[in-house]
């Protein structure tokens, strides 16, 4: 077995990481907001794609750039390290309300200078009524506004930020270079017919792409000039040589395809960076980096030996730390659902590739190097994912387990054995299906060929829908009734449990439809107001169709619906079925009263203990609850499948919705807005995250957990089935322990057809100490949901949720 070196960092990488993790309250940068406001005001007569292209070009020309001491990969998102830009075209309402108090946010604070406060208060009024969020609310019906106000459905994230959740076509970028892409645009423009309406609009889009690609080249040239300027005054010969090498790298990649590993990595980073300057959507991912960068790595490291492996890993480390510099500021309410300010920049390694039509293991030496580099650095970025398949070698799987043992929540695994065949059934071409990658958290798509948001825009609170189903359609939190029904626990008039399930079916169908209606509004406003030009230029077939991604330019386009509280739904239904209808030990009105009182008082607390201990719980491989949950979930899935997204029939293959369970950290704020539930959960406490069991209810170990998760209709949940597991570090102390985990992984993926799994390897005691003494644990990384975050950067509620998760042993 290969033993990875998981302890070595160069001195420069140590210094850069230490500096970054000790930025507790990052600054806010207003340069982008100012530049975009200037260009929007100057070019109100221009079509929106051209206006946005000119704004991005102006910003790339005028913004502050810098090269940090001794860094090897260059490019900055904002004027200061880890500063978060402001994107006023999406929203200004929360900015105006919260900007003066951003430093006081628990776990998500930002430092805002008085000058930046002044700038924002000066420019925000111009944007009022013109932002994406404003225009969404101008289109919502009163019913939709009411639903959003209650929080049963939440869709704030995409009204206040960009789409993203995709990977662009990095292989095409590396093959053609920026000038080659401009040639492709020019060729397509030569075939435009300005007497055809679609071509008239298409010409403006293609013109915008050309403006942006030229601006990207000029921007890279600015860094070449800066590196040379710094080299001229650098006293250390070794650093002077590095600066001149970086300048030469930039000279090449500003126009031409890269010729070395360093150049290829630098070009990919520049594009990754500018995508997140163009739009503030998160989960901009790299797709299968070990595949498209391997030819450069092989040439430099293995064949020419012009680059040694250790220096290649240092280049990767430098890139990973640049990803950590990228930052995003969210509204206070939205930040609670994305605890730790994650960017979800995923890198996928492993899996399979087709050789002469036959699948072959795709693991190569760069796969090991990327895995090892992440294991050494132990950062939150990139979000590292491994594609598992039955033919994966024990050597590589063992290497993955070695990195898991490092305790920073990576790598996560996705399963080729279910993703590939299900993608092919959807209509994805075989070659593309074998080239899928993890995007953001756990969702999957084909890099450079899939539209935005392979995970959804709106979250449904399953627990609140379930409570409404039990009480005649009344939302327990707000008291509002959106879809009235006759049957209610408080009336004691359910005749049998089948009527409870019928009530659930009715309510979830209603809320599912409403969530799609809301998504349609948000989708439409994003399409009309903020087309992403650079991003679309790097996704097939946007240039050929002369359409942005949002207009239907991508080859594929599926979107998943999202929900929170899956385990709470199953556990609650199981408790009602067993204790109320089968055993009759709890009366309908008795349960309703206990829920309304949040189990207050001795009698209600005793009833709560019966709900907790006397009914089966998801996560223990018990069909009586697992299959009931599946039955309830399938109603949601069937309803979701009926709908098409706004790109349907406009070009892409697909255009439908499917389910997904990537709840990020929304289980905490959603739980805070949810009253007591029949599984014994108290009001305002976190819901279960993803498809994981509710905290403290999975008593029979990890094997039972994967048994339960494997019963979910995974083949229909193509947005991903998120499973978090927490293991005590003592569980993986020796080779025999690692073998146990490898067997468990193979069983989960091959026998139970699991979609995804990830591990927290950290003790409860360590987490409690880190919460008590945060300054001593600034570099402690934990898995939150489908992403990792620095534990001390989380809010206290999010920290408590992770501490409360069941700690298993093998």
PLM segments and residue spans:
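A conserved hydrophobic secondary-structure block that centers on an alpha-helix together
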Residues: 231-238
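Extended non-globular scaffold/tether segments
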Residues: 207-218
């Amino acid at each position: 077995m290969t033993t990875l070196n998981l302890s070595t960092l160069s001195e420069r990488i140590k210094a850069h990481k230490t500096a970054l993790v000790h930025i507790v309250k990052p600054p806010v940068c207003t340069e982008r907001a100012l530049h975009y406001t200037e260009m929007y005001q100057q070019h109100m007569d221009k079509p929106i794609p051209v206006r946005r292209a000119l704004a991005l070009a102006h910003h790339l020309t005028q913004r502050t750039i810098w090269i940090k001491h001794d860094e090897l990969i260059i490019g900055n998102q904002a004027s200061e390290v880890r500063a978060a830009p402001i994107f006023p075209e999406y929203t200004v309402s929360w900015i105006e309300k919260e900007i003066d108090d951003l430093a006081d946010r628990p776990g998500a604070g930002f430092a805002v200078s008085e000058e930046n406060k002044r700038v924002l208060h000066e420019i925000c009024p111009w944007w009022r009524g013109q932002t994406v969020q404003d225009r969404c609310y101008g289109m919502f019906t009163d019913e939709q506004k009411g639903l959003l106000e209650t929080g049963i459905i939440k869709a704030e994230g995409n009204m206040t930020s960009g789409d993203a959740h995709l990977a662009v076509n990095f292989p095409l970028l590396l093959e053609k270079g920026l000038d080659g892409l401009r040639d492709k645009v020019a060729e397509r423009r030569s075939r435009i017919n300005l007497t055809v309406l679609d071509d008239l609009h298409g010409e403006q889009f293609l013109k915008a792409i050309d403006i942006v690609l030229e601006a990207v080249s000029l921007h890279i040239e600015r860094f070449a000039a800066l590196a040379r300027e710094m080299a001229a005054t650098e006293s250390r010969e070794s650093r002077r040589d590095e600066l001149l090498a970086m300048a030469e790298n930039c000279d090449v990649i500003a126009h031409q395809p890269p010729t070395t590993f360093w150049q290829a990595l630098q070009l990919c980073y520049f594009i990754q960076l500018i995508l997140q300057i163009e739009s503030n959507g998160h989960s901009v991912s790299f797709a299968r980096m070990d595949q498209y960068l391997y030819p450069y790595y092989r040439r430099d490291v293995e064949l020419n030996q012009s680059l040694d492996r250790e220096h290649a890993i240092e280049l990767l480390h430098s890139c990973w730390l640049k990803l950590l510099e990228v930052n995003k500021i969210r509204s206070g309410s939205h930040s609670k659902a994305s605890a730790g300010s994650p960017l979800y920049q995923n890198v996928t390694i492993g899996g399979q590739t087709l050789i002469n039509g036959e699948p072959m293991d795709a693991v190569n030496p760069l796969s090991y190097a990327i895995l090892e580099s992440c294991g050494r650095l132990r950062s939150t970025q990139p979000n590292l994912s491994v594609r598992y398949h039955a033919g994966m070698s024990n050597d590589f799987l063992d290497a993955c387990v070695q990195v898991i043992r490092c305790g920073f929540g990576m790598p996560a695994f996705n399963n080729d054995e279910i993703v590939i065949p299900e993608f092919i059934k959807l209509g994805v071409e075989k070659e593309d299906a074998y080239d899928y990658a993890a995007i953001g958290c756990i969702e999957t798509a084909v890099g450079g060929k899939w539209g935005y948001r392979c995970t959804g825009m709106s979250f449904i609170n399953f627990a609140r829908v379930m409570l409404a189903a039990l009480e005649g359609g009344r939302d327990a939190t707000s008291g509002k009734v959106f879809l009235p029904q006759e049957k209610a626990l408080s009336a004691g008039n359910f005749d049998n449990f089948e009527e409870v399930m019928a009530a659930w079916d009715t309510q979830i169908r209603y809320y599912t439809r409403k969530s799609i209606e809301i998504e349609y509004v948000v989708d439409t406003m994003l399409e009309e107001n903020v087309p992403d030009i650079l991003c679309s230029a790097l996704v097939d077939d946007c240039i050929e169709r002369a359409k942005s991604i949002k207009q239907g330019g991508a080859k594929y386009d599926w979107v998943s619906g999202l929900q929170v509280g899956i385990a709470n739904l199953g556990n609650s239904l199981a408790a009602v079925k067993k204790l109320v209808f089968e055993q009759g030990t709890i009366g309908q009105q008795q349960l309703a009263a206990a829920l309304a009182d949040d189990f207050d008082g001795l009698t209600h607390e005793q009833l709560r203990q019966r709900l907790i201990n006397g009914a089966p719980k998801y996560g223990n491989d018990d069909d009586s609850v697992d299959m009931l949950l599946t039955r309830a979930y399938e109603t949601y899935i069937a309803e979701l499948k009926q709908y098409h997204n706004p790109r349907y029939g406009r070009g892409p293959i697909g255009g439908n919705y499917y389910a997904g369970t990537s709840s990020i950290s929304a289980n905490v704020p959603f739980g805070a807005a949810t009253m007591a539930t029949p599984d014994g959960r108290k009001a305002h406490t976190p819901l279960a995250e993803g498809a994981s069991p509710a905290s403290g209810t999975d008593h029979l170990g990890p094997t039972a957990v994967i048994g339960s998760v494997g019963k979910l209709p995974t083949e229909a949940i193509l947005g991903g089935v998120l499973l978090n597991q927490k293991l005590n570090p003592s569980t993986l102390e020796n080779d025999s322990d690692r073998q146990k985990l490898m067997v468990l992984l193979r069983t989960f993926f091959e026998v139970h057809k699991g979609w995804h799994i990830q591990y927290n390897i950290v003790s409860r005691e360590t987490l409690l100490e880190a919460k008590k003494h945060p300054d001593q644990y600034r570099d402690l990384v934990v898995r939150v949901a489908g992403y990792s975050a620095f534990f001390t950067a989380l809010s206290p509620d999010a920290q408590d949720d992770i501490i409360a998760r069941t700690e298993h042993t093998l």
